[in-house]
């Protein structure tokens, strides 16, 4: 079939299920497209991995899936991975590669108190490109940084059907609880929009939550909108992971709620 006659196939990749926050915005905007989602749970969390390992695992997974489902675009729905894998992916694939960047610029434009919090993984908050974003767009703001793996784990548990541990969440955010003029929070990890309501309970002074998911969905549409969007009946949205996990059977039962037909385990060497 000619490439222009099929609906675009888009792969979302993350170390966990945080990328759901980006996928759900894309599916809301472009409901008839063909979506694949891969979470590298065998390598989770990426914030604890070396850059070389993140690059290797991301490339391997994307290339393996591309062999089976020729891709029209890849969305790295992970802030930590986006800081290191975009150049090698763009060298390996002749298709759009879309990353996620913390929404520091829009945060600096919307804050009234000029006091912003950047909530991200430990790996992301240390990256030099975060310094560059702040220097470029938020020089007139105080930008607090909090790197956390715990909140990523809490979001993972929520999406797998467990209740959110608010005590642990409050404890992790306690250093910001007394900052009365902290009015804007940058959700610098794709997991965090999944627990935004719970975060807001812990930080009631925050008025603006900056989530780039909707902007990423619009970017996908812009890059691929010249394609025919007529759905093909033989195509189903598919999910992949890289290791079996305890809640797998329960997780599979909920797949249809997110618009996926099946979950398959793929192996990355």
Swiss-Prot record:
Reactions accelerated catalytically: L-glutamate = D-glutamate
Gene Ontology terms: biological process: cell wall organization; peptidoglycan biosynthetic process; regulation of cell shape
GO molecular function terms noted in the UniProt entry: glutamate racemase activity
Record-listed substrate binding positions: 14-15, 46-47, 79-80, 190-191
Pfam families registered for this protein in UniProt: Asp_Glu_race
Pathway: Cell wall biogenesis; peptidoglycan biosynthesis
InterPro entries (UniProt xref): Asp/Glu/hydantoin_racemase, Asp/Glu_race, Asp/Glu_racemase_AS_1, Asp/Glu_racemase_AS_2, Glu_race
Enzyme nomenclature, EC number: 5.1.1.3
Matching SUPFAM superfamilies: Aspartate/glutamate racemase
Active site: 78 (proton donor/acceptor), 189 (proton donor/acceptor)
Keywords assigned: Cell shape, Cell wall biogenesis/degradation, Isomerase, Peptidoglycan synthesis
Enzyme class: isomerase
Stated family: Belongs to the aspartate/glutamate racemases family.
PANTHER family: GLUTAMATE RACEMASE (PTHR21198:SF2)
Known role: Provides the (R)-glutamate required for cell wall biosynthesis.
HAMAP family: Glu_racemase (MF_00258)
Protein name, entry field: Glutamate racemase
Species: Haemophilus influenzae (strain PittGG)
Lineage, broadest ranks: Bacteria, Pseudomonadati, Pseudomonadota, Gammaproteobacteria, Pasteurellales
């Amino acid at each position: 079939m000619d490439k222009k006659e099929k609906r675009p196939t888009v792969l979302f990749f993350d170390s966990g299920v945080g990328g759901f926050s980006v996928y759900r915005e894309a599916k809301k905007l472009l409901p008839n497209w063909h979506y694949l989602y891969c979470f590298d749970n065998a390598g989770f969390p990426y914030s604890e991995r070396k850059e070389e390992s993140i690059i290797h695992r991301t490339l391997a997974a994307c290339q393996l899936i591309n062999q089976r489902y020729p891709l029209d675009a890849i969305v790295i729905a992970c802030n930590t991975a986006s800081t290191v894998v975009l150049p090698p992916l763009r060298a390996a694939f002749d298709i759009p590669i879309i990353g996620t960047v913390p929404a520091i610029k829009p945060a600096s434009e919307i804050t009234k108190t000029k006091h912003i919090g950047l909530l991200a993984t430990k790996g992301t908050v240390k990256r030099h490109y975060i310094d560059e974003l702040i220097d470029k767009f938020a020089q007139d703001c105080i930008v607090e940084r909090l790197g956390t793996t715990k909140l990523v784990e809490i979001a993972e548990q929520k999406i797998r059907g467990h209740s959110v541990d608010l005590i642990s969440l409050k404890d992790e955010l306690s250093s910001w609880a007394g900052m009365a003029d902290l009015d804007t929070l940058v959700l610098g990890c794709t997991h965090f929009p999944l627990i935004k309501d719970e975060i807001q309970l812990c930080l009631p002074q925050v008025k603006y939550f900056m989530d780039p998911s909707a902007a990423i969905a619009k970017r996908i549409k812009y890059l691929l909108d010249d394609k025919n969007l007529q759905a093909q009946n033989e195509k189903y949205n598919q999910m992949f992971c890289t290791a079996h996990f305890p809640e797998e059977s329960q997780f599979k039962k909920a797949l249809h709620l997110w618009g996926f037909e099946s979950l398959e385990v793929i192996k990355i060497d």
